[in-house]
Amino acid sequence: MGLLATSLRPSRAVSLAADTSPPPAECDIAVVGAGIVGLATARELAARHPDARIAVLEREPRLAAHQTTHSSGVIHAGIYYRPGSLKARLCVSGARELYVYCEERGIPARRSGKVIVATRPSELPRLEELARRAEANGVQGARLLDAGELREVEPHVHGLAALHSPATGVVDFGRVAAALAAAARAGGATIHGGCPVLGSTPTDRGLELRHARGKTRARAAVFCAGAWSDRLAVAA
């Protein structure tokens, strides 16, 4: 079984440079990691708690340096996940909200659609199961195609059948990350690059983060470290 979705060329014009200033010795909330999850978290915290001192600690000198800008850039519609699961609900609602977010901020996001193609008879039951999941999850416009309909949607693909998801799209997540960072900063958050967190220690008022540039005491911390999360968990 295969899939096809087009992509957008990543923008080279968006600045993802992090601040070079050292992190504060104290803050109310620390966010560890300035990928798209950490930046979205900082933006939301700054909006909900405008008086809080929020500091984002990022190991690299630039934002979104790892998974965020090295993925396929696909906005997933929610086909694959177990119906009723948190991941399914968040994927469907998150895709819808992301399109709106990008449109409001002038970030190019293309609803290119996706076809998941069955090329062998043995793959047809799995394709039908994905179609059932898509319907159960409320994926907009998803439908099964026979071979003729598949050729109409994508003439360069050959298969026995396909699941078409017109709600699937692509976006430059570097641009999304830059917009989130700008919103977080506008809300009062600070973002500090070149500051890998090495570990944390609970205190009577929260926790103390040890990082390459010293220590930061925070009342609370949100760890959004992606592939580094397991190492931070061990070091906690």
Predicted features and spans:
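Extreme N-terminal leader/targeting segments of oxidoreductases
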Residues: M1-I29, E44-R53
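Glycine-rich Rossmann-fold phosphate-binding loop(s) that bind the pyrophosphate
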Residues: A34-L39
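Glycine-rich FAD pyrophosphate-binding loop
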Residues: A46-H70
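Short loop/edge segments at beta-strand edges and connector loops
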Residues: E58, R111, L145-A147, G193-C195, ...
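Dinucleotide-binding Rossmann-like beta1-alpha1 core, especially the glycine-rich loop
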Residues: G73-V153, G159
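Helical element adjacent to the flavin cofactor pocket in flavoenzyme catalytic cores
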Residues: L163-A220, C224-R231
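Glycine-rich beta-alpha-beta "Rossmann" dinucleotide-binding loop(s) and their flanking helix/strand
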Residues: L232-A236
